[in-house]
Amino acid sequence: MSALIETRALARRDERRQAVLLQPTDFALHRADRVSITGASGSGKSVFLRALALLDAPTSGQVLWNHRPIANADIPEYRSRICYLSQRPALIDGTVLDNLRFPFSLKSLRKRHFELATVTALLQHAGKSPDFLAKNASDLSGGESQVVALIRTLQLNPEVLLLDEPTAALDPASSRDVEALIDAWFADDPTRAYVWVSHDLEQAQRMSDIHLHMSAGVLSGATQA
Protein backbone atom coordinates (compact mmCIF):
# COMPACT_ATOMS: atom_id res chain seq x y z
CA MET A 1 0.00 0.00 0.00
CA SER A 2 1.34 3.43 -0.90
CA ALA A 3 2.14 5.92 1.86
CA LEU A 4 0.15 9.10 2.42
CA ILE A 5 3.08 10.69 4.22
CA GLU A 6 6.65 9.49 4.32
CA THR A 7 9.80 10.79 5.96
CA ARG A 8 13.30 10.05 4.76
CA ALA A 9 16.12 10.59 7.25
CA LEU A 10 14.12 13.43 8.83
CA ALA A 11 16.23 15.07 11.53
CA ARG A 12 16.21 18.16 13.74
CA ARG A 13 19.02 19.77 15.66
CA ASP A 14 19.10 22.78 17.98
CA GLU A 15 22.20 24.54 16.70
CA ARG A 16 22.23 27.06 19.53
CA ARG A 17 22.43 24.35 22.17
CA GLN A 18 24.29 21.92 19.90
CA ALA A 19 21.64 19.33 20.78
CA VAL A 20 20.13 16.63 18.60
CA LEU A 21 16.33 16.77 18.91
CA LEU A 22 15.44 14.11 16.35
CA GLN A 23 17.75 11.46 14.96
CA PRO A 24 17.42 10.70 11.20
CA THR A 25 13.99 9.08 10.98
CA ASP A 26 12.33 7.01 8.27
CA PHE A 27 8.56 6.72 8.71
CA ALA A 28 5.54 5.96 6.56
CA LEU A 29 1.86 6.58 7.29
CA HIS A 30 -0.61 4.67 5.12
CA ARG A 31 -4.34 4.98 4.64
CA ALA A 32 -6.32 3.48 7.54
CA ASP A 33 -3.30 3.61 9.88
CA ARG A 34 -3.92 4.49 13.51
CA VAL A 35 -0.47 5.17 14.94
CA SER A 36 0.46 6.09 18.50
CA ILE A 37 3.81 7.38 19.73
CA THR A 38 4.70 7.25 23.42
CA GLY A 39 7.85 8.23 25.29
CA ALA A 40 9.15 10.37 28.10
CA SER A 41 8.84 14.15 28.11
CA GLY A 42 11.60 15.65 26.00
CA SER A 43 12.18 12.44 24.06
CA GLY A 44 11.35 14.05 20.71
CA LYS A 45 7.70 13.05 20.18
CA SER A 46 6.41 16.57 19.61
CA VAL A 47 9.54 17.54 17.68
CA PHE A 48 8.83 14.75 15.22
CA LEU A 49 5.13 15.56 14.94
CA ARG A 50 5.74 19.27 14.36
CA ALA A 51 8.31 18.47 11.67
CA LEU A 52 5.80 16.10 10.07
CA ALA A 53 3.23 18.92 10.10
CA LEU A 54 5.78 21.27 8.45
CA LEU A 55 5.51 23.63 11.41
CA ASP A 56 9.23 23.41 12.17
CA ALA A 57 11.75 23.05 9.37
CA PRO A 58 13.93 19.92 9.58
CA THR A 59 17.68 20.29 9.76
CA SER A 60 17.97 17.53 7.17
CA GLY A 61 15.85 14.92 5.44
CA GLN A 62 12.52 15.09 3.66
CA VAL A 63 8.78 14.84 4.16
CA LEU A 64 6.98 13.34 1.16
CA TRP A 65 3.27 13.69 0.48
CA ASN A 66 1.80 11.20 -1.97
CA HIS A 67 5.37 10.21 -2.94
CA ARG A 68 6.52 13.72 -3.76
CA PRO A 69 8.57 16.34 -1.91
CA ILE A 70 6.44 19.27 -0.76
CA ALA A 71 7.15 22.55 -2.53
CA ASN A 72 6.68 25.82 -0.64
CA ALA A 73 3.65 26.61 -2.80
CA ASP A 74 2.02 23.34 -1.68
CA ILE A 75 2.39 23.91 2.06
CA PRO A 76 -1.02 25.65 2.61
CA GLU A 77 -2.80 22.78 0.83
CA TYR A 78 -0.76 20.23 2.78
CA ARG A 79 -1.70 21.84 6.08
CA SER A 80 -5.39 21.83 5.16
CA ARG A 81 -5.21 18.08 4.42
CA ILE A 82 -2.67 17.03 7.03
CA CYS A 83 -3.92 18.77 10.17
CA TYR A 84 -2.00 19.25 13.41
CA LEU A 85 -3.74 19.65 16.77
CA SER A 86 -1.75 20.74 19.80
CA GLN A 87 -2.34 20.13 23.48
CA ARG A 88 -3.37 23.77 24.02
CA PRO A 89 -4.92 25.10 20.81
CA ALA A 90 -5.55 28.80 20.38
CA LEU A 91 -9.08 30.13 19.98
CA ILE A 92 -10.03 33.57 18.71
CA ASP A 93 -12.19 36.04 20.65
CA GLY A 94 -15.89 35.52 20.11
CA THR A 95 -18.30 32.61 20.22
CA VAL A 96 -17.78 28.96 19.44
CA LEU A 97 -19.52 29.59 16.12
CA ASP A 98 -17.09 32.41 15.33
CA ASN A 99 -14.20 30.04 15.94
CA LEU A 100 -15.67 27.35 13.71
CA ARG A 101 -16.25 29.83 10.89
CA PHE A 102 -12.78 31.33 11.19
CA PRO A 103 -10.83 28.86 8.98
CA PHE A 104 -12.97 29.77 5.99
CA SER A 105 -11.73 33.36 6.17
CA LEU A 106 -8.19 32.17 5.38
CA LYS A 107 -6.95 32.63 1.83
CA SER A 108 -6.22 28.93 1.34
CA LEU A 109 -9.81 27.97 2.27
CA ARG A 110 -11.89 30.77 0.78
CA LYS A 111 -13.24 28.51 -1.95
CA ARG A 112 -14.75 26.25 0.71
CA HIS A 113 -17.82 27.00 2.80
CA PHE A 114 -18.86 26.59 6.41
CA GLU A 115 -21.55 23.92 6.80
CA LEU A 116 -23.70 24.13 9.91
CA ALA A 117 -25.04 20.60 9.44
CA THR A 118 -21.52 19.15 9.50
CA VAL A 119 -20.66 21.05 12.67
CA THR A 120 -23.93 20.06 14.36
CA ALA A 121 -23.25 16.38 13.66
CA LEU A 122 -19.75 16.69 15.11
CA LEU A 123 -21.13 18.41 18.20
CA GLN A 124 -23.48 15.47 18.74
CA HIS A 125 -20.55 13.04 18.71
CA ALA A 126 -19.00 15.13 21.50
CA GLY A 127 -22.26 15.23 23.48
CA LYS A 128 -22.87 18.94 22.79
CA SER A 129 -26.16 20.54 21.77
CA PRO A 130 -26.44 23.26 19.08
CA ASP A 131 -26.75 25.81 21.92
CA PHE A 132 -23.05 25.24 22.54
CA LEU A 133 -22.31 27.30 19.41
CA ALA A 134 -23.43 30.48 21.19
CA LYS A 135 -21.03 30.09 24.12
CA ASN A 136 -18.21 32.60 24.35
CA ALA A 137 -14.77 31.11 23.82
CA SER A 138 -13.46 32.87 26.94
CA ASP A 139 -16.00 30.97 29.06
CA LEU A 140 -15.01 27.50 27.86
CA SER A 141 -13.23 24.95 30.01
CA GLY A 142 -10.00 23.38 28.79
CA GLY A 143 -11.91 20.33 27.62
CA GLU A 144 -14.51 22.39 25.79
CA SER A 145 -11.78 24.44 24.11
CA GLN A 146 -10.11 21.28 22.86
CA VAL A 147 -13.43 19.98 21.52
CA VAL A 148 -13.94 23.26 19.64
CA ALA A 149 -10.43 23.13 18.21
CA LEU A 150 -10.92 19.53 17.10
CA ILE A 151 -14.29 20.23 15.47
CA ARG A 152 -12.74 23.27 13.77
CA THR A 153 -10.22 20.87 12.25
CA LEU A 154 -12.52 17.93 11.49
CA GLN A 155 -15.00 20.08 9.55
CA LEU A 156 -12.22 20.61 6.97
CA ASN A 157 -12.34 16.89 6.15
CA PRO A 158 -8.61 16.26 6.60
CA GLU A 159 -6.88 13.17 5.23
CA VAL A 160 -4.62 12.88 8.27
CA LEU A 161 -4.66 14.09 11.87
CA LEU A 162 -1.42 14.75 13.74
CA LEU A 163 -2.48 14.80 17.39
CA ASP A 164 0.03 16.16 19.88
CA GLU A 165 -1.19 14.95 23.28
CA PRO A 166 -4.70 16.35 22.65
CA THR A 167 -6.10 15.09 25.96
CA ALA A 168 -3.08 15.57 28.24
CA ALA A 169 -4.61 18.50 30.16
CA LEU A 170 -8.20 17.24 30.16
CA ASP A 171 -10.39 15.51 32.72
CA PRO A 172 -11.58 11.95 31.93
CA ALA A 173 -14.99 13.06 30.59
CA SER A 174 -13.44 15.61 28.22
CA SER A 175 -10.87 13.05 27.11
CA ARG A 176 -13.67 10.67 26.19
CA ASP A 177 -15.37 13.44 24.18
CA VAL A 178 -12.17 13.99 22.18
CA GLU A 179 -11.66 10.27 21.66
CA ALA A 180 -15.28 9.87 20.51
CA LEU A 181 -14.86 12.64 17.93
CA ILE A 182 -11.71 11.08 16.54
CA ASP A 183 -13.23 7.60 16.50
CA ALA A 184 -16.25 8.90 14.56
CA TRP A 185 -14.06 10.82 12.09
CA PHE A 186 -11.90 7.77 11.46
CA ALA A 187 -14.85 5.37 11.10
CA ASP A 188 -16.53 7.66 8.56
CA ASP A 189 -13.84 7.15 5.90
CA PRO A 190 -11.50 4.13 5.71
CA THR A 191 -8.89 6.12 3.75
CA ARG A 192 -8.11 8.41 6.69
CA ALA A 193 -5.20 8.03 9.10
CA TYR A 194 -3.77 9.59 12.22
CA VAL A 195 -0.70 9.81 14.43
CA TRP A 196 -1.45 10.25 18.13
CA VAL A 197 1.32 11.35 20.50
CA SER A 198 0.43 10.43 24.07
CA HIS A 199 2.03 10.13 27.50
CA ASP A 200 -0.74 7.67 28.45
CA LEU A 201 0.18 4.13 27.42
CA GLU A 202 -3.34 2.78 28.00
CA GLN A 203 -4.83 5.48 25.77
CA ALA A 204 -2.18 4.88 23.12
CA GLN A 205 -3.03 1.19 23.03
CA ARG A 206 -6.76 1.91 22.99
CA MET A 207 -6.63 4.47 20.20
CA SER A 208 -4.13 2.85 17.83
CA ASP A 209 -3.22 -0.31 15.95
CA ILE A 210 0.46 0.54 15.50
CA HIS A 211 2.49 1.48 18.58
CA LEU A 212 5.79 3.35 18.29
CA HIS A 213 8.14 4.59 20.98
CA MET A 214 10.40 7.64 21.06
CA SER A 215 13.55 7.78 23.16
CA ALA A 216 16.32 10.38 22.89
CA GLY A 217 15.14 11.37 19.42
CA VAL A 218 15.02 7.79 18.12
CA LEU A 219 11.68 6.44 16.86
CA SER A 220 11.26 2.69 17.14
CA GLY A 221 8.60 0.03 17.49
CA ALA A 222 6.03 -0.55 14.75
CA THR A 223 4.19 -3.24 16.71
CA GLN A 224 0.65 -4.12 15.64
CA ALA A 225 -2.16 -4.20 18.20
Region locations from a protein language model:
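Conserved ABC ATPase signature
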Residues: 136-140, 144
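Helix-to-loop junction immediately C-terminal to a conserved catalytic motif
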Residues: 53
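Catalytic Walker B motif of ABC-type/P-loop ATPase nucleotide-binding domains
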Residues: 161-165
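ABC ATPase NBD coupling module
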Residues: 69-83
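Conserved ABC ATPase "signature" region
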Residues: 113-132
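Conserved catalytic motifs of ABC-family nucleotide-binding domains
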Residues: 89-98, 109-110
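The feature captures the beta-strand-to-loop junction immediately N-terminal to the Walker
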Residues: 38-40
